């Protein structure tokens, strides 16, 4: 139990502290299957913008940092063994907004700030994506719920941010071939500001 609201120990450090030392995906999938599960959803990324697979588009991922394991890949392998359809959930589109509260802490750090530290060579902006003017009411963490569809004063995501999210999802689809995708969005990712990203992902997944 670490406090992550500080200028030194931030979310980036929590990612590194996660080791998953007792995680046994094959044992768990067998257990779920024996209990009657007929599909399984793995967490691909949460609002923290950290990818739980060997992602070439997001260096802050579970292979490079933390457990040093391909979490989605190991889930996928176990699911294949038990013929259990795999789903992957993607929650990262809103990291642009969710991490604004961290601009008070370490979310404005850059790659240069990591010199001599465990995260040397990694750019915190790849994780936090906070080099932008924050949304209206950003100091109140509850405001984001009224900005879910990118309205009500929400800061609009950059084209680079949207394309990076799209590339990450498409690469995950190509690498692990999930039978299902879940997006923690009202309709599709970036609905309300740019429908093309979600439609591109949808078309690629079906085709």
Tell what function each PLM region has.
Residues 1-207:
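Mature catalytic domains of secreted/periplasmic carbohydrate-active enzymes
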